[in-house]
Every structure is written in structure tokens, then in C-alpha cells.
Amino acid sequence: VYKGRIPLNKYARLLGDIGEKYNFAKLAPETNDVGMTVTTILQDEGYPNLYFYTKLLRKKRKNRPEEDKFPGWLTTTKNRSVIIENLEKDIREENVIVKDPFFVQEAYTFIYDGAGRPIARGKHRMNNSSMDLDLEGETYSDDAIFGKAITNHIRCHSASNTVVIPQ
């Protein structure tokens, strides 16, 4: 388990190296922010097993939207609650076991806000990148939770659920 900040090129290299250790495991960097740079680096370096999300594009003079695929994972308002609810269900039903101490720590401050959105307590009161401050000055994050939610979603929807033990 790793938590911290490193330059994006080193992060991409770290992901690629860990993915290779696990027989080129599927990688799905979140592309909402700086993850697009990480995904681009992985693509440029030829990582063979990136996750691609599908986007429907409406083109002029076309009746049907066209599908286009983009590398990485894009969290949207439509899929955010779905992936969190599916992770919660799979944890409750013991389909997954989480041993990540950062996930456990974040779970204590992960709530549903007034609009019913799953979010780290106080997250949008004062935004400071991935760490946020609430009114009392305490920091909260939901990075580990969303990382596990994305991983769980991809695990549930992939063609193969084979787990490869590293050499």
C-alpha cells in the first residue's frame, strides 16, 4: 500500500512495474485529473493491459451515437454512486476483503452528503487537491475508497477474474 505524492512519470513507471509483476495486470488510472498524464505515459511506454472506458459521441448528421474508447477510468456523476454502492455491497457480503489501512481510516469519515452523494466528510468545503480540510481543520480523503471502488467495478465486469500471484 502506498500513499503519497511522486512525480507523474515516476508514478506511471511504478504502476507499470507493479502491473508487470502481476503478469501485466489490468491498470485503470483515474483520468479525471492528472491521471490522464499517467495513462498517456503508460500508453507511450507500451503497457499492454490498460483499462479503456467507452464514451458515446454524438456526431452531426448521424442518427446513432458512435462509441469511442479512452484509456483509464473516468469517474462521473453517473457512475460515482454506483461503484461505491457496489463496493459496499461486496464488502458487506464478504465478496471482497480489504486489508488496506488507508481504506479503513478513510471509511470512518466517508459519508453521504446533503445531496445524497458519497463523499469524504468536509471534502468540498476547502479544496486542496486530493486532501481536503473541514471547518475544524482536519484533513479527509477518499482516494483509497475510490481506488478500491474502481478496482472492484473492473473486477466484477471483466471477462476473467483470474488472480495471478507474482513470482
Explain the meaning of each model-derived region:
Residues 1-119:
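Mg2+-dependent endonuclease catalytic cores in nucleic-acid-processing enzymes, primarily RNase H-like
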Residues 99-167:
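Charge-patterned, long linear interaction tracts outside catalytic cores
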